[in-house]
Amino acid sequence: MAVLSNDKRWLVTLVASNKVLAPVLPEIVKQGMGNLYTFLDNHLSALPTRCSLTTLTYADVRRLTATPSPASFLESLNFGNINNNSDVHGNKKKAYNYNVSSPVDLARLYLPNYLAVFSAFDKSMDMSATLRLLGRKNYPIQIFLSSDPLHNIQSLADDVRENVRNRASHFDESHWTQIFFDQCFDKLKNLVQGLPLSVAKKEELLDQLSKWKIKGNFN
């Protein structure tokens, strides 16, 4: 059975996103979250009332919220996503285990529950999760920096998540015109250009995307 042009463009965009871009994002997130974890742990250990991420308690989080600091935001994070808190305690936040044992746990705190199911910074991470983490703009420090100052990783990742990943995940045949297909690949390429990767790696990824785009245009 012949594949319609719009269907083919959708499939090619989905496959190219998952095969070319998705595999390189977890390592970038890993580096950023590792830096954030170290920053927060150092900050907590330097406070008059010391604590740490690995020993964090509900009382610590409440106390930190009441005092303006780089850790004041902790209460707003999704602690239900770690230590089986939601499964065991539901919405009873006072009963949660607030220990943040690793950068992976820290990353899971920033995500909605349905995306916080990965166990490492690897292929178990959904691309939507990595794009959300890359696109977030309110970390206490800047943890994702482009190798090119003209590019803003947060905006580029958000653009890909909203206008490529989400649109491909919720298929509507009428969207997948030639113009929209071209725009999707432009957004994917723009994100690659903004990632903190070597020139050689960027060229490799851009070349792969170009080849996939040709497949989407070939009838």
Identify the role of each PLM range:
Residues 1-167, 171-219:
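Feature for intrinsically disordered/low-complexity regulatory segments and propeptides
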